[in-house]
């Protein structure tokens, strides 16, 4: 049962201060650096030649040449010095951090329980025990009523500074549990198998697992993706027979091209394993019967066809979302006897307005998530041509297909929220077309939805494009430029930041902030073309959109220039770097979470396993001088100038395989050496975690509280 790995947002930050509409934050009003000396990283000459150009990088040494091992003492000394400097900033802010943390904790249901789901005669759920960081998972035998705890994450996490459950699956005979876990944050999972009848942990030990795992139909074999030694890259889909050594495992698919990501899953019918190799806008799909896992894979779509697809299966047909004939995808079906492209039958044609996002097949219907002119909806389609949309009470919301492991169920479980509506779980009855509420997020310290308001506006970018902006604030927020705004953005890989709910965000709204999400190009809020218009040669549209959204908010009196704090993570951290370089005068503070700011050097470094697959997103500066010049022109790290910049908080993880630790470190070192202001610049590197920072729920809240304290201090708020 796939545990979604959440890699996004830091709920972002800010606080309250008054300014006139025309005011620009002056240097004397900024959050200042500490009296103690900030760490100064050594500059060591390093240059390389590309296409007749010389690339100088005096902080190249911050990448340990033995990576992923980091033992260079000079590097460790610098990172530890930055952490010590960060802690010196925190020392006088401990009361504020604790206040914010207690607010977060007060909104956390300490004994939260999931809505149970039924699978193969058992009812499954997870719950938290009060005070514990991790979940406990249990199941009830529906025939006997006997309850069994099968995964106690708190116990598994004992003795580890970091713990993350990757995936788990139960064998079809309900006897065996397989689960994967990561204790370093490097996303190289280990897998174990438990006999649920006896409680015995089998001798089977799998290392270097990508994360996902799934039993075949017999329950005697386990499918997983194997990471290459020393690289965060899977090239083999493996089958492990219970009782064997891992060295005996067999590869059922090998990906020869380092430029393709490899993954797998199981169809809702449980009849096929689906193997997908993907590179940017191109995917190749293969299927293997779950009853014969060593059978020759059957190709559904070749990479040469040059398009993306999502696949599920029911009643002898594959159902596929594909953007072969329209960028926003069409829905097709094809017999599993001969699933070649020529036999595909269109069920729903592609549309300029409706972007088809995901699907799940059931016995009697298909659930389909779509976005119509930027607004989400769930469609229900039966196998004889009938269809309708699920009706929700709000116009702007986030809805997705939830956990639905049973193929033969008469309802679809949906997850729902909006910027003012807490997370909810509904069961939608297909026959009666009614929603039954199964769960509403509990906020123990209290939440009154009527006290808050949300809206969507369109900001005009410099090229005339209308960019959607989702905004939430407390009622009474004055559009007279007197209150602050927190602006969040991402804008890459077609990922869309939906208008969702956040209990953390309330600590900003209750202090007078408006919180805005800029749905910039590079995401896919307005369709697949929205994504295409923010990548490769059009990448700078993403940065321009974000800055232009901020300027639109100033123009429309939501906020004064210089009273906007901004935040983004990963590729959103790249966006923050680009925004601060392009328009430093606009920002009150900048939070760059695990920021992908050293884009050019990373795309030049073929030793990094993620570099070749990423060329389809950013361009290949190794072979293409035009791509090199473009990346150099906008890469945030390359474009730091000798000028004034706003206060900044930078975060990273030593074991992060996605955005390596040296990117935030190099950014911080270079920024500190060039900026001409006296504003605060601090960096927090988690020395025992990766891309997703602290793994426990309270540890994460503490991280967020520290980040909020930085932002609140930047706005002059001390309580």
Task: Label every model-predicted segment.
Residues 1-4:
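Positively charged n-region of N-terminal signal peptides that target proteins for export
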């Amino acid at each position: 049962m796939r545990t979604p790995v959440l890699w996004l947002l830091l709920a972002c930050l800010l606080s309250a201060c008054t300014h006139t509409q025309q005011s620009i934050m002056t240097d004397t009003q900024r959050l200042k650096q500490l009296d103690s000396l900030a760490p100064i990283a050594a500059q060591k000459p390093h240059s390389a030649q590309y296409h007749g150009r010389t690339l100088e990088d005096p902080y190249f040494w911050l990448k340990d040449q033995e990576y992923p091992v980091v033992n260079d003492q000079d590097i460790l000394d610098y990172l530890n010095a930055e952490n010590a400097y960060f802690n010196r900033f925190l020392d006088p802010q401990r009361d504020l951090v604790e206040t914010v943390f207690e607010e977060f904790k007060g909104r956390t249901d300490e004994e939260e329980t999931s809505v149970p789901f039924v699978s193969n005669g058992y009812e499954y759920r997870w719950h938290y025990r009060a005070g514990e960081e991790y979940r406990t998972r249990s199941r009830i035998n529906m025939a006997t009523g006997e309850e069994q705890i099968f995964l106690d994450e708190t116990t598994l996490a004992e003795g580890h500074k970091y713990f993350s459950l990757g995936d788990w699956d139960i064998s079809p005979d309900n006897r065996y549990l397989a689960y994967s876990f990561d204790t370093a944050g490097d996303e190289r999972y280990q897998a174990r198998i438990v006999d649920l009848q006896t409680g015995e942990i089998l001798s089977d030990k799998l290392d270097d697992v990508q994360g996902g795992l799934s039993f075949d139909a017999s329950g005697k074999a386990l499918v997983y993706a194997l990471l290459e030694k020393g690289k965060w890259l899977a090239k083999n889909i493996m089958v492990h027979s219970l009782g064997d050594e891992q060295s005996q495992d067999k590869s059922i698919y090998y990906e020869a091209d380092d430029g393709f990501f490899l993954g797998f899953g199981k169809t809702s019918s449980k009849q096929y394993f689906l193997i997908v190799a993907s590179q940017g806008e191109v995917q190749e799909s293969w299927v293997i019967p779950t009853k014969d896992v060593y059978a020759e894979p059957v190709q559904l779509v070749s990479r040469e066809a040059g398009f993306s697809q999502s696949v599920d299966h029911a009643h002898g047909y594959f159902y596929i979302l594909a953007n072969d004939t329209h960028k926003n995808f069409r829905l097709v079906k094809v017999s599993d006897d001969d699933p070649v492209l020529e036999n595909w039958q269109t069920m729903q044609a592609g549309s300029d307005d409706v972007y088809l996002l995901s699907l799940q097949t059931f016995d009697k219907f298909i659930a389909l998530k779509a976005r119509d002119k930027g607004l989400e909806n769930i469609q229900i389609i039966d196998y004889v041509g009938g269809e309708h949309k699920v009706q929700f009470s709000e116009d702007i919301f986030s809805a997705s297909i939830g956990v639905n492991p049973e193929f033969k169920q008469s309802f679809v479980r949906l997850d729902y929220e909006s910027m003012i509506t807490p997370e909810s779980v509904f069961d939608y009855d297909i026959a009666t077309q009614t929603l039954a509420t199964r769960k509403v997020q509990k906020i123990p310290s209290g939440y009154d939805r009527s006290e808050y308001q949300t809206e969507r506006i369109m900001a005009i970018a410099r090229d005339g494009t209308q960019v959607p902006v989702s905004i939430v604030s407390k009622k009474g927020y004055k559009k007279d430029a007197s209150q602050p705004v927190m602006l969040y953005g991402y804008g890459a890989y077609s990922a869309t930041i939906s208008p969702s709910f956040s209990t953390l965000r309330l600590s900003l709204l209750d202090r007078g902030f408006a919180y805005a999400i800029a749905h910039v190009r590079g995401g896919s809020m307005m369709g697949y073309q929205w994504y295409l218009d923010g990548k490769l040669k059009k990448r700078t549209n993403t940065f321009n959109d974000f800055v232009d959204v901020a300027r639109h908010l100033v123009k429309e009196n939501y906020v004064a220039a210089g009273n906007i704090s901004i935040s983004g993570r990963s590729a959103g951290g790249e966006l923050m770097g680009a925004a601060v370089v392009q328009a430093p005068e606009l920002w009150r503070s900048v939070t760059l979470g695990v920021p992908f700011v050293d884009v050019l050097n990373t795309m030049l470094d073929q030793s990094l396993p993620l570099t070749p697959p990423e060329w389809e997103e950013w361009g290949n500066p190794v072979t293409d001088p035009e791509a090199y010049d473009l990346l150099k022109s906008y890469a945030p790290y390359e474009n730091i100038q000798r000028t004034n910049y706003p206060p900044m908080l930078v975060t990273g993880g030593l074991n992060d395989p996605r955005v390596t630790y040296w990117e935030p470190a190099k950014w911080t070192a270079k920024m500190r050496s060039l900026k001409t202001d006296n504003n605060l610049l601090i960096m927090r590197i988690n020395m025992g975690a990766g891309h997703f920072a602290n793994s426990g729920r309270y540890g994460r809240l503490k991280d967020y509280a520290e980040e909020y304290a930085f932002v609140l201090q930047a706005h002059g708020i001390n309580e």
